Amino acid sequence: MTMKRKSARRGSSMLEFTLVGIPIIFLLISTFELARGMWNYHTLAYAVKEGTRYASVHGVNCTASPNTCGVTIAQITQRILDAGIGLPSNQLSLRFTDAGGTTNCLANNCLTNNTVWPPAPGNAVGNNIQIDGNLPFQSVISMFWPGSGSGTTFGTFNFPASSRETVKF
């Protein structure tokens, strides 16, 4: 009499999922977080570049009569925020630098600054202007970190962006 032999390969699907599935899920979430961080970094760089380009073509000749195309810090900031879809204006800090000096503000506060920029004499054709942006980024991956409680947080990374142009008009 022969007995049917059970398969020698037995396993527990719950245990196998725990050992393989959870690290895979964590890897996927980590990949999305890295992509979100790089998206913010690239968007910030693009937005600051667009703001600097916009300011560089609104120089001294825009403020001379009969032209009325001079721009303010508020208008440049709005241009940066329009180009930077998803950038939080309450965290984005901007620094406007020209030959005459530097202006620092959070994007929310910059939106109410009606100072013409770049001001004379820094708005002369050929002068350099620069806009710097800084965006703090904190990953939400700590929510998914195994064994973490409510007190576990990861550090904040500052994403810098800088753009320099010469005044063209």
Report residues per predicted region:
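Low-complexity, S/T/G/P-rich flexible repeat/linker segments used as non-globular hinges
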Residues: 62, 139-169
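A generic structural signal for short, solvent-exposed coil/turn residues
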Residues: 36, 86-88, 123, 153-157
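Short amphipathic secondary-structure patches
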Residues: 52-132
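Alpha-helical assembly-interface signal, strongest on the long, hydrophobic N-terminal helix that forms
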Residues: 2-81
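Surface-exposed loop/turn and secondary-structure junction residues enriched for glycine/proline
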Residues: 20, 41-42, 57, 90, ...
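A generic fold-level signal
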Residues: 9, 124-126, 158
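Intrinsic disorder/low-complexity segments enriched in polar/small residues
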Residues: 5-7, 131, 166
